[in-house]
A protein has these predicted regions:
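Conserved lysine of the Walker
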Residues: 36
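Helix-to-loop junction immediately C-terminal to a conserved catalytic motif
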Residues: 44
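Conserved NTPase motor "head" modules and their coupling/switch loops across ABC/AAA+ ATPases, GTPases
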Residues: 1-31, 168-301, 310, 314, ...
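Structural recognition of the conserved hydrophobic beta-strand(s) that form the central parallel beta-sheet
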Residues: 72, 327-335
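Walker B catalytic acidic pair
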Residues: 305-307
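An accessory alpha-helical subdomain
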Residues: 79, 120-209, 224
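Nucleotide-state sensing region of NTPase/ATPase domains
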Residues: 47-128, 137-140, 144, 196, ...
């Protein structure tokens, strides 16, 4: 499901705001500080109960108010979502007047945020890339979520035993790690394999419009499992026991996985400009979004904040043609609306909002 209308009350800088969202592409533009990012943030909060800007939801409450409220509608299903956050109280989430958890919300109204952290995906720590990978699988597969929780529950218990120096007690949790961890690795490897295919298809489309897009076709993208693939997870755990005991933590396993982006054996983060890294990160996130629709029949909202930052005009032109190939709901922001002559889209499917005129 996806929102067709969203209403905000006392959210960030907005006292009251109602927006009817296109089923395809939506552009919010205006000068810095006008509230563009806050609108995207409100949609993200409405889809997962969290912000992509802060872990403190109380900071989203408008100054002078005691709470914020988000109400969203899905015209296709008739569903109504209500989110309330009052100071010093937990967030309250209802779908069709029934209380739901954050996990249930994320599966009902899935979304992906491409924000300042995602822009420089390759500059971030492996933990960030794992979370980005896991988020999509979490939304799509209850089986994956079950194995994820099972693995990390066993990992926590194993590490607790290692801290006491009891290797025999630690080994008691190896079976849980092996069973759940092997499945996690399978899901992740399959995702990366299929997303790579989609990514390369997108690059081929861009190459038809701009030769500079060839830069993105020669990239090697591989997942590192976090353990010795030739030995397997079971044998890797056995061989690392002495080191685990010495360090008092489990050093190998899917919790150490990473996705590596390279070109000619050099890390992308070391050779790509910031603008090139940003386009790569957007294309990879978009490919993952398409993967979820293709293999799991879910259509996450795709949120992209501040499109043109860090991009020169040539790199921006390199990316823009892909917008008309995005079938899911795409919501993005930019300082100015400079796309009239650059995006050939049906006006009924592409809506523009001048944020300064909305307030």
């Amino acid at each position: 499901m996806a929102f067709s209308r969203i209403e905000l009350r006392n959210f960030r800088c907005f006292e009251a705001l109602t927006i009817d969202i296109s089923s395809n592409s939506n552009l919010f533009y205006g000068k810095n500080g006008c509230g563009k990012t806050s609108i995207l943030e409100s949609i993200y909060v409405a889809s997962c109960g969290r912000s992509f800007r802060t872990s403190n939801l109380e900071s989203l409450i408008k100054n002078g108010s005691n709470s914020f409220k988000i109400k969203a509608y899905d015209d296709n299903t008739g569903s109504i979502l209500e989110i309330n956050k009052t100071k010093s109280k937990s967030i309250n989430i209802k779908i069709n007047n029934s209380l739901v958890t954050i996990s249930e919300l994320a599966r009902t109204f899935p979304s992906f945020s491409i924000d300042s952290k995602t822009f420089f995906y390759n500059d971030n720590a492996p933990d960030y890339r794992r979370k980005h990978l896991d988020r999509g699988l979490f939304i799509a597969s209850t089986e994956y979520a079950k194995d994820w929780f099972g693995y990390f529950r066993g990992l926590k218990q194993r590490n607790a035993a290692l801290k006491t120096g009891d290797i025999h007690q630690a080994k008691a949790y190896d079976e849980a790690l092996i069973n759940h961890g092997t499945k996690l690795n399978y899901f992740r490897e399959n995702l990366v394999l299929e997303v790579k295919k989609i990514y390369l298809d997108l690059v081929k489309i861009l190459e038809q419009y701009n030769g500079r897009a060839q830069l993105f076709s020669g990239i090697d993208i591989n997942i590192k499992s976090g353990f010795n693939d030739e030995l397997g997870l079971k044998e890797s755990l056995i061989q690392s026991e002495s080191v685990d005991l010495k360090r008092k933590t489990t050093i190998l396993g899917p919790h150490k996985a990473d996705i590596i982006f390279e070109s000619k054996d050099l890390l992308i983060k070391d050779i790509f400009s910031r603008g090139e890294q940003k386009i790569l990160s957007i294309l990879w996130s978009l490919s993952q979004n398409i993967y979820l629709e293709k293999f799991f029949n879910i259509s996450p909202i795709l949120l992209l904040d501040d499109l043109s930052s860090e991009l020169d005009s040539e790199m921006l032109d390199c990316f823009l043609p892909i917008i008309k190939y995005i079938e899911n709901r795409f919501i993005f922001s930019n300082i100015v609306d400079s796309f009239n002559s650059k995006i050939d889209l049906n006006e009924q499917s592409f809506k523009k909002f001048h944020v300064e005129q909305l307030t």
